[in-house]
Amino acid sequence: MSSHSTLTVQNLGKHYGGTPVFAQVDFAVQPGEFVAIVGDSGVGKSTLLNCLAGLDQWDEGDITYTAANGTATRLADLDDTARALWRRAHVGFVFQAFHVLPHLDVAQNVALPLMLLGQTDPARVQAMLDAVGLGALGSRLPQQLSGGQLQRVAIARALVHRPGLLLADEPTGNLDPTTAALVMDLLLAQTREQGASLVLVTHSDAAAARADRVLRLTASGMVG
């Protein structure tokens, strides 16, 4: 997905063992748009994000990414290997749990998406660390950082390879209100600077209020 791609979700449905999680989900995300997804606990918001990234399989409907030149990538047409390669190149992730590797220093953690693409770019890694206010901490280990600093590492890592789409699942859920607001400031500043689209799952009214659009996921579809 380039920075100018459109995400289109059509009639998406997912169930586990015959039990519906969600159904008839339709929405689109325009290039550079920030969309917040809210909804009751257990309605499948995190599962939906996993489907958007091709990490989880859905049962009905389509997920399509259309580039500015009109080239469409339909995730259902990609096998597991092709999906993984596509995801590594075009999607970034930020989660409530930071998922940093404790045996790697901060700079090495940020560089992971580039490494998976077979790239080495120390200058880009340093630029992202500078952008999130951790420029002097690249050699530190994750256990030496605070929760807010770890989420900054996660943001830098998610955007270091310039993805067109950032998927964020409760990225401020473990943070105090002041730190959460600072992390949201940083997340929005960096995605907008890169022209990336942002899809955010959140229970935070404060975070959702900053979105271009707020969608509510229900068992029977998307509202908003």
Stretch-by-stretch model annotation:
Residues 5-7, 12-218:
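ABC family nucleotide-binding domain
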Residues 219-224:
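Conserved switch/coupling elements of ABC/ABC-like ATPase nucleotide-binding domains
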